[in-house]
Swiss-Prot record:
It comes from Escherichia coli (strain K12). This is Ancillary SecYEG translocon subunit. Changing N8A: Decreases degradation by FtsH. SUPFAM superfamilies: TPR-like (SSF48452). GO terms for molecular function: protein-containing complex binding. Changing K15A: Does not affect degradation by FtsH. Is stable during exponential growth and degraded in stationary phase by the essential FtsH protease. Degradation is influenced by the alarmone (p)ppGpp, but not by inorganic polyphosphate (polyP), RpoS, RcsB or PpiD.
């Protein structure tokens, strides 16, 4: 760092700085202004895109929930074309529709697509929980257990424990199921879920 003896030295240093860097500063200012304009345009474009995606998502899922003709293919098209949170949410809605129709393979595929479309950890956790539940129904217990292993965070511990118990029980591992449910009961769990897991533990003894 340069040390100055008096105010004149500081003034001279400033003069030298602008003499040596004036052109670079001017270019920097121009680039900075250009970048600012570019950023504002990009930001405005992003807001408009998000607004359009939100509206299209609402229209798609509303049509699906109302059972309108061709609403499922239209929602599938929306989910496939929107590699973002809205696409992932559409995949969740579609997966539920497929589960209701007992088209479990389609539901699993739609959930896996949704996972690839979002970076939001909470949404990923929800999708993985749904996927694990579908995998248990498909008798894919090992796949369900692997899916559950990807879900992190204390807030999900009880629900994960409940599903883990179901997956293990479907494999005939009663002790593993008991351990999972006992861990779930001891976690930060709602009274209703705790009571349900305790009931499952009690049923193992019957």
């Amino acid at each position: 760092m340069e040390i100055y003896e008096n105010e004149n030295d500081q003034v001279e240093a400033v003069k030298r700085f602008f003499a040596e860097n004036g052109k670079a500063l001017a270019v920097g200012v121009i680039l900075g202004v250009g970048a600012l304009i570019g950023w504002r345009y990009w930001n405005s474009h992003q807001v408009d895109s998000a607004r359009s995606a939100s509206l299209a998502y609402q229209n798609a899922v509303t049509a699906v929930s109302e059972g309108k003709p061709d609403s499922i293919p239209a929602a599938e098209k929306f989910a496939a074309e929107n590699k973002n949170t809205y696409g992932a949410l559409a995949s969740l809605e579609l997966a539920q529709q497929f589960v209701d129709k007992n088209e479990l393979e389609k539901a699993a595929a739609q959930l896996q697509q949704g996972l690839a479309d979002t970076s939001d950890e909470n949404l990923k956790a929800v999708i993985n929980l749904r996927l694990a539940r579908v995998q248990v129904q498909l008798k894919q217990a090992d796949a369900a257990l692997k899916t559950l292993d990807t879900i992190k965070g204390e807030g999900w511990a009880a629900i994960v424990a409940d599903l883990r118990g179901e997956a293990l029980l479907s494999k005939g591992d009663k002790q593993g199921a008991r351990s999972a449910w006992e861990a779930g009961v001891k976690s930060d769990v709602t009274p209703a879920l705790s009571e349900m897991m305790q009931m499952k533990i009690n049923n193992l003894s019957i």
